[in-house]
Amino acid sequence: MAVHEELPVVVVGAGPVGLAAAAHLLERGIEPLVLEAGASAGSAVAAWGHVRLFSPWRYDVDAAARRLLEATGWTAPDPDALPTGAELVERYLTPLAATPQIAARLRTSSRVVAISREGADKTRSLGRERLAYRVRVQGPDGATHHVRARAVLDASGTWGQPNPVGTGGLPAFGEVGSSVVTGPLPDVLGADRALFAGRRTLVVGMGHSAANTLLSLVELARDEPGTRIAWAVRGGSPRRLYGGGTDDELPARGLLGTRLRDAVESGLVTLATRTSIERIEPVGPSGGTWDVGAAGTSDVPTAPGPVRVQGTTRDGELDLEVDTVVGATGFRPDLDMLREVRLDLDPVVESPRALADLIDPNHHSCGTVPPHGEALLAHPDTGFYVVGMKSYGRAPTFLLATGYEQVRSIAAALAGDREAADLVQLDLPATGVCSSDLALDPVSGEVAEVSCCGTSPAAAEPVLVTFGAPAGSLGFATGTAHGRSADEQEDPR
């Protein structure tokens, strides 16, 4: 039986999944309260506004949200068009947040800093399920207050929690606070151009965010002499990222891998495999400061001095002088605010335990993750759910449409409609469309999202290239076999 029905369901985050949750709750007659840390809905999406999704609009708009919007006279975008992050905000999230139903229940500049049961820490069990949730919120003036809730959906995402570039999941010495290390999606050809033009960049990471940045740098190098590019991956080779080429079901994804392979084999990009980065230290006096945020954007048009990146690679010692390091190493969930909530998390992926085997990137790509709903997302504290990208923990296989289905199912469960909650369905292409994977548009050169799913062709022969310098000066050996697929076959020692 539901308790505290007079209280709202707090939704943490006003991104696509958070706003979809509010829409589904409203359709079920349940009062939502959406708390967004940013100044407006979709703040995290706006941070990568220059990125074009590969998933067309038909998969980017939630059904309940669409019904709210259509009641206002909203005109839906072309279902087959590919939006940028900025367009997703402008044409979907902003109008959705402005609907009378959502606007009255949305609080921006309201950062959730802690969640607990009212009057009970994590250790208290007696009567726990009858207690309301207590959500501690930091407002725009820095003051904190509490909001009482009957249930909580944490849709805060992972954008502000990038993985470090250092080895073993820990920041390299000198990494924390370094103005040289950017976030995963800098606007190489736009706002952040001065940070990369005519300079030496090391990109660290094995996903499509890394590939997108690398290809943008290759394009920049055509116009800006002296632009040099190195790429470090932790795995044995990039075979999986190269994908299926012309055999790929999604042409833009296949083209992404083909372009990247060509850039490596031609020597435009220097690849180091089995890379462990231990230290990042300044070289000489700094040439200025660059305040780089999570998206790699900056308000200061000067760049820092060079750094020396040290560690090891498959071929031996790594000792590389660069001007910028792009950390495209993925994300992890921020669990600090959930310390007083009883969670059942998988120790590897940091997703709900029941979901972990379905999304583990060692075994699954986005197209092989089955639809799932409330039953797999529940935690020991009844009425608390982590949804959206954060529900996948460290797994990069999240689909935006999957998040919409998650919150539809949870809203049904909170309304007492068990049958609807358990009837989980998802309409997607056979290959899936991963919301976190990115590529370059084959015609315009703009950034476009791609699926994470693909075939893995046989590795090509290794090629020796250098980092825009005389042969032998850096001498990274390159290969074409990928990350975790290779890790499964090779002992990391």
Across the structure, where does each feature detected by a protein language model lie?
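Flavin (primarily FAD) cofactor-binding/catalytic cores of flavoenzymes
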Residues: A2-A44, H50, A81-S435
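Flavin (FAD/FMN) cofactor-binding and adjacent substrate-gating region
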Residues: V51-T75, R124-E129
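Short alpha-helix boundary/capping motifs
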Residues: L53, L69, G73, S365-C366, ...
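Juxtamembrane/interface motifs at transmembrane-helix termini
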Residues: A63-A65, A430, P442
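Long, low-complexity intrinsically disordered regions
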Residues: L438-R493
